[in-house]
Design a protein with these regions (language model features):
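Catalytic histidine-centered segment of alpha/beta-hydrolase-like enzymes
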Residues: 99-113
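Non-transmembrane alpha-helical segments in soluble domains
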Residues: 36-39, 86, 117
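Acidic beta-to-alpha connecting loop that harbors the catalytic carboxylate
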Residues: 72-74, 98-101
Length: 122
């Protein structure tokens, strides 16, 4: 689930959920390995690894200006670590607190695009 449970429940009727399940069962293009590989990629990404596991050393290696965009209700990639690292590198931070969760850019596209454009103009 890429959105919050509240958003999913508000947007998904019982009939829609059953149709989605039926479609997934009959969709030969659906491959559960895709989700497994995405999870493995997220778990393997450790910016501190080249620095002996030190987040402080990793942060000190960042020289660029950084904008971090997080959805506070993201249940797929929790925002805490990105926010902590952002603080360590003095990144600009855009936090959005809505029920779209991991689908933040779908729900708040104009806001995110505007923030990125403004950041790039600096």
């Amino acid at each position: 689930m890429l959105t919050t449970p509240q958003h999913y429940n508000a947007e998904t009727t019982r009939e829609k959920a059953l149709q989605s399940l039926s479609a997934a069962k009959s969709d030969s293009a659906y491959d559960a390995n895709n989700h497994i590989r995405q999870d493995q990629a997220m778990m393997a990404l450790d910016v501190s690894e080249p620095f002996g596991g030190s987040m402080e050393k990793a942060a000190s290696a960042v020289k660029a200006k950084v904008l971090i965009v997080v959805a506070l209700q993201d249940h797929t990639v929790t925002p805490g670590p990105a926010m902590e690292f952002g603080k360590a590198i003095r990144a600009e931070l855009l936090t959005v607190n809505n029920e779209c969760g991991h689908q933040l850019t779908s729900c708040e596209n104009d806001r995110v695009v505007g923030a990125v454009a403004e950041f790039l103009q600096q």
